[in-house]
């Protein structure tokens, strides 16, 4: 049975592992970055939450870190997420409808959503994210006249991968979910595995991450809509381990 490497923080891969098993794949997790909650920011978050007219959640990690600290009955009823996975995650905490874009899974797609036209002028938008997140949406919403409040409630910390017992046998591809993770992962690769990881097939869900992978040295990168789509695009193991052309 082929193995897919899931390269992401260890708090996130459970659903990915289930997806792999359902598709007939083994899954192995490597975490070059881990998530650390910002306790000080979380203490301030409930008051920011109460004052907001709408909340934008940037990721499932932002939701899982922040939501347990909030009373949703005290906050706004308008909630926006960057994608379907975040939407489903937030639905476990919020009794209110959750909106996400239908034509993408990034800040650009969120900005195109019609909900912004239905909000009152000068509405206060709370963006809940990790430290060092993109400012694209905040900047664009400010230009549109919204008041922006940003809660950076977690850190992404480099985490040393244990390579002592790592084996390349049966590893057919990898799935990676951020450019920052791609850069840290390739930074940690030992010399004896460098050629293997340069030639491995990588899947990701966004062209920006695909570009980051190519910059750090990945030769074979494919952009897909989801992990399920990635797995279904390789019906046979031989297709995963042989060189392929980039999209």
Name what the model sees in each region:
Residues 1-247:
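Signature of uroporphyrinogen-III synthase
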């Amino acid at each position: 049975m082929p193995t897919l490497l899931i390269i992401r923080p260890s708090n996130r891969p459970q659903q990915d592992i289930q997806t792999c098993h359902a598709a007939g794949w083994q899954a192995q997790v490597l975490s070059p970055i881990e998530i650390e909650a910002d306790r000080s920011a979380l203490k301030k978050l409930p008051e920011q939450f109460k004052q907001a007219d709408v909340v934008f959640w940037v990721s499932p990690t932002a939701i899982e870190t922040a939501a347990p600290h909030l009373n949703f009955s005290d906050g706004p009823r308008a909630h926006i997420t960057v994608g379907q996975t975040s939407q489903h995650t937030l639905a476990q905490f919020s009794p209110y409808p959750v909106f996400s874009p239908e034509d993408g899974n990034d800040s650009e797609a969120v900005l195109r959503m019609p909900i912004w036209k239905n909000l009152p002028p000068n509405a206060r938008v709370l963006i809940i994210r990790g430290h060092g997140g993109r400012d694209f949406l905040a900047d664009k919403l400010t230009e549109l006249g919204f008041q922006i409040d940003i809660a950076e409630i977690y850190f992404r910390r480099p985490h040393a991968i244990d390579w002592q017992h790592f084996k390349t046998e049966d590893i057919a591809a990898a799935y990676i979910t951020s450019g920052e993770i791609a850069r840290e992962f390739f930074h940690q690769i030992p010399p004896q595995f460098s050629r293997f990881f340069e030639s491995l097939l990588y899947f990701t869900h966004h062209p920006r991450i695909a570009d980051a992978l190519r910059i750090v040295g990945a030769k074979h990168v494919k952009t897909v809509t989801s992990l399920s789509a990635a797995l279904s695009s390789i019906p046979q193991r031989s297709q995963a381990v042989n060189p392929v052309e980039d999209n």
